[in-house]
Amino acid sequence: GSEMCIRDRNIVIAIIFISVIGTLLHFMYEWSGHNKVVSLFAAVNESTWEHIKIALTPTFIWTLYDGAVYGLNPNYFEAKALSILVIIVLIPLLFYAYQLITKKAILPIDITIFYLTIIISNLVFYYIINMESLHFFYTYISVIVLFIIFGSYMVLTLLPIKNFLFKDPITKRYGIRGHSHHEHKEK
């Protein structure tokens, strides 16, 4: 019926919105003249974490829309939490899996992984939204997971963990210090 048509349209719009905003966020920190506020939401270096972040930012923004449309759905928080976890897990999983074979990063593959992850994330969201109502326990856990993810997302740019996910492969640094403009300034 018409409800399914609206949902089909919403999934396509979600994928396009998240993909376009995510792509722009790859360059936004540079374009903003290295604005600290922009650094919280945009990629500040070429690390895997920053590529996860630029998929999460538009997903969080899209939550303002899908929360209004689907927020009363009993599976909304489960759908949101799992769709976000798909992004957090799938980007590094696919990125490091193909590099085991190629031994190096290949830009067209990286870009494909980014968009493919956004598509899969949204398919997971819409699949769970359309399932039979899940137990309230899962809603409770999902809300906690969402708070943890959002809190971590806000903190990790400013205080990156010193591991491979956060290390810029070019500058070998972390967080904002991993941005290539720091290389030129520090003499």
Question: Which residues are covered by each model-predicted region?
Answer:
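C-terminal, well-folded lobe of enzymatic/effector domains
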Residues: 108-187
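Short aromatic-rich membrane-water interface segments that cap or initiate transmembrane helices
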Residues: 40-53
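Membrane-interface helix caps and helix-loop-helix hairpins in membrane proteins
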Residues: 73-74, 97-108, 130-135
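Small-polar-interrupted transmembrane alpha-helices in polytopic inner-membrane proteins
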Residues: 22, 26, 62-63, 79-96
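Short, small-residue-biased leader/transition segments that mark boundaries at the very start
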Residues: 1-6
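Alpha-helical transmembrane segments of multi-pass membrane proteins
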Residues: 19-33
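Alpha-helical transmembrane segments of multi-pass membrane proteins, especially transporters
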Residues: 14, 79-87, 110, 114, ...
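Alpha-helical transmembrane segments and their helix-start/interface "positive-inside/aromatic belt" motifs
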Residues: 7-16, 138-145
